[in-house]
C-alpha cells in the first residue's frame, strides 16, 4: 500500500541534491585543499544525504524506513571492498618493510639511459605505482627524484612531469592495491580482478602509444646523469637488503591473480609471504619500527604487526627515501573507508527516493547505441571531475548514475567500471582545481596546464575507451527477455 503513495521525483527535483553536493564540495575543496578527504568530503556526503532524504520524505512520500534500508543495503554491498582495503593497507606496509618495493625501484633505476629517459621514467613510475597502489606516493617520492634527473638532463619540466604522471596513473589505474581501483569495482559491483583484467584491453594499448611517444621524444637527449642515479640506488642499497629473492612475492601474487583466486585470499597470502620475508631479510628495520634495542622474537613480532596496522616511518638518511618507505598500513585506509560508507549513505538515499532512477532515465533517452553510452559515461566522468573537484566523488557518482542504465541495456558491469576508470581516474590530475591536479602540481613544481599536454596516457585513455566501444572488442550484451548473449 505504501508503494502506491510514493511519487516519482522530477529530474529537476532530483538534481537538487547533486547541486548541493557540488556547491558544498567546491567550498570544502577551497577550504581544506588536499585535506578534504580527511573529513570534509565525508561531512558533505552526509549533509547531502540528509537533503536527499528530506526531499524524498516531503515531496515523494518516501518512508524513512525505506531510505534506511536502502542505505544499509548499499553499505552491505561494499563490505567486501572495505575488508579488501584493510588488507591492502597491511599489504602495502609488508611490501615496503620486507624490501619488495625498494628492490623493484633499485633494479628499475638501473634501466635508465639518457636516450630513453622519458620512457624509462614512465615505466619506473608505472612499476612503483602498481606495487604501491598510489599515484600520489609514487609522484611524491620517486617522481621528485626523476624530476631532478630530468631537469639535469635538460628536459622541459612539462615533458618530465607528463612522463611521471602518465606512469603513476597507469599503476594507480590497474593496481589491485589502488583505492580508486577498488572503489570503481565496488561501486559498480564488479569483482576486483575481473575489473582489472578487463581494463587491460584499453590500458595496455594506451600505455604502448604513450611509451612510443616518449621514446621518440627522448632520442634527442643524450646527457648523462648516472651519478645522481647511482647515488639514489646506493641509498636504497644501504637502507635495505636488496635481493632478487624478494621478487618471489610479486611473482606468486601475479600467478594467484592469473588463476583468478579470490581477492581476499590473494591479498592475505601476499601479505603473509611479505611478512615472512621481512623477518628474514629486514630484521633491523622491524627492530627500528618496534623501537627495540635488540632484534629478538618479541620486537620482530611487534615491528611486523605495527607495519600491518599503523603508519611506519624508516629513517634512511635520504628525504625522498623516507617518504617512499613510509607505509600507512590499515590505519591509512580509514579515510577512504569512511568516504565509501558516507557515499553509500548518499547513494542509498538517492536510490530509495527514486531520484537516481529519474536522472538516469533522462540519460537513457539519448543513449541508443553502445558508443553513445560509453561516450556519455566518459564525458560525464570528466564533467564530474571538473565540477566536484574530487576523483573519489566522481567515481561514486558516475558508477551510481550509469549502473542501472548499463544493466537495462544488457551490458556487463565491468564495462562500466572500466569506462569509469578510463574517464575519471586518469583525468582528475588534468583539472587544475581538482584535488589531484592541485596536489601533483604542488609536489612537482609544475603548473597543471604546463604538464597537461604531455600526460599522453591520461589523454589517450578516455579516447581508447570510446574507440574500443566503437569496435566492440570483448564487449558482451545480454538480453534478459531471450537470455541470449551477443558478442559485439
Question: What does each model-identified segment do?
Answer:
Residues 1-85, 201-211, 218-342, 483-488:
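Hydrophobic transmembrane alpha-helices of multi-pass small-molecule transporters
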Residues 11-14, 18, 123-134, 244-252, ...:
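Alpha-helical transmembrane segments and their immediate juxtamembrane interface regions
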Residues 21, 44, 48, 52, ...:
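Alpha-helical transmembrane segments in multi-pass membrane proteins
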Residues 57-60, 150-157, 174-178, 277-288, ...:
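Juxtamembrane membrane-interface segments at transmembrane alpha-helix termini
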Residues 60-151, 309-403:
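Membrane-embedded alpha-helical segments and adjacent helix-loop junctions characteristic
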Residues 80-167, 181, 201-207, 211-219, ...:
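Early transmembrane hairpin of solute transport permeases
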Amino acid at each position: 500500500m505504501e508503494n502506491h503513495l510514493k511519487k516519482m521525483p522530477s529530474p529537476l527535483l532530483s538534481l537538487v541534491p547533486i547541486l548541493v553536493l557540488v556547491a558544498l564540495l567546491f567550498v570544502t575543496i577551497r577550504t581544506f585543499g588536499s585535506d578534504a578527504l580527511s573529513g570534509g568530503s565525508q561531512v558533505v556526503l552526509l549533509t547531502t544525504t540528509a537533503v536527499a532524504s528530506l526531499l524524498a520524505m516531503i515531496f515523494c512520500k518516501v518512508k524513512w524506513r525505506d531510505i534506511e534500508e536502502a542505505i544499509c543495503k548499499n553499505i552491505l554491498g561494499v563490505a567486501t571492498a572495505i575488508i579488501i582495503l584493510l588488507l591492502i593497507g597491511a599489504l602495502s606496509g609488508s611490501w615496503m618493510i620486507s624490501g619488495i618495493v625498494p628492490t623493484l625501484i633499485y633494479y628499475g633505476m638501473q634501466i635508465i639511459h639518457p636516450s630513453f629517459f622519458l620512457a624509462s621514467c614512465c615505466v619506473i613510475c608505472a612499476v612503483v605505482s602498481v606495487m604501491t597502489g598510489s599515484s600520489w606516493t609514487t609522484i611524491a617520492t620517486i617522481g621528485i627524484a626523476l624530476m631532478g634527473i630530468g631537469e639535469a638532463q635538460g628536459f622541459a619540466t612539462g615533458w618530465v612531469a607528463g612522463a611521471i604522471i602518465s606512469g603513476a596513473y597507469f599503476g594507480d589505474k590497474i593496481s589491485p592495491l589502488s583505492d580508486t581501483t577498488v572503489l570503481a569495482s565496488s561501486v559498480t559491483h564488479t569483482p576486483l580482478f575481473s575489473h582489472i583484467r578487463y581494463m587491460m584491453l584499453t590500458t595496455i594499448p594506451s600505455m604502448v602509444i604513450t611509451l612510443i611517444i616518449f621514446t621518440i621524444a627522448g632520442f634527442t637527449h643524450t646527457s648523462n646523469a648516472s651519478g645522481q642515479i647511482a647515488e639514489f640506488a646506493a641509498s636504497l642499497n644501504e637502507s635495505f637488503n636488496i635481493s632478487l629473492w624478494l621478487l618471489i612475492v610479486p611473482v606468486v601474487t601475479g600467478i594467484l591473480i592469473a588463476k583468478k583466486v579470490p581477492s581476499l585470499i590473494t591479498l592475505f597470502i601476499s601479505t603473509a609471504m611479505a611478512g615472512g620475508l621481512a623477518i628474514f631479510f629486514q630484521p633491523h628495520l622491524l627492530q627500528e619500527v618496534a623501537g627495540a634495542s635488540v632484534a629478538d622474537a618479541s620486537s620482530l613480532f611487534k615491528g611486523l604487526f605495527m607495519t600491518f596496522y599503523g603508519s611506519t616511518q624508516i629513517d634512511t638518511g635520504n628525504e625522498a627515501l623516507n617518504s617512499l618507505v613510509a607505509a600507512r598500513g590499515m590505519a591509512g585506509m580509514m579515510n577512504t573507508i569512511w568516504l565509501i560508507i558516507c557515499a553509500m549513505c548518499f547513494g542509498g538515499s538517492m536510490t530509495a527516493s527514486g531520484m537516481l532512477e529519474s536522472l538516469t532515465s533522462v540519460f537513457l533517452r539519448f543513449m541508443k547505441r553502445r558508443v553513445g553510452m560509453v561516450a556519455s559515461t566518459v564525458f560525464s566522468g570528466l564533467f564530474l571531475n571538473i565540477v566536484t573537484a574530487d576523483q573519489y566523488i566522481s567515481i561514486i557518482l558516475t558508477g551510481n548514475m550509469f549502473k542501472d542504465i548499463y544493466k537495462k541495456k544488457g551490458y556487463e558491469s565491468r564495462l562500466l567500471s572500466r569506462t569509469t576508470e578510463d574517464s575519471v581516474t586518469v583525468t582528475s590530475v588534468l583539472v587544475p582545481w581538482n584535488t589531484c591536479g592541485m596536489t601533483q602540481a604542488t609536489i612537482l613544481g609544475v603548473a597543471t596546464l604546463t604538464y597537461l599536454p604531455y600526460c599522453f596516457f591520461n589523454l589517450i585513455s578516455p579516447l581508447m575507451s570510446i574507440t574500443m566501444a566503437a569496435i566492440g572488442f570483448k564487449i558482451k550484451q545480454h538480453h534478459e527477455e531471450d537470455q541470449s548473449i551477443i558478442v559485439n
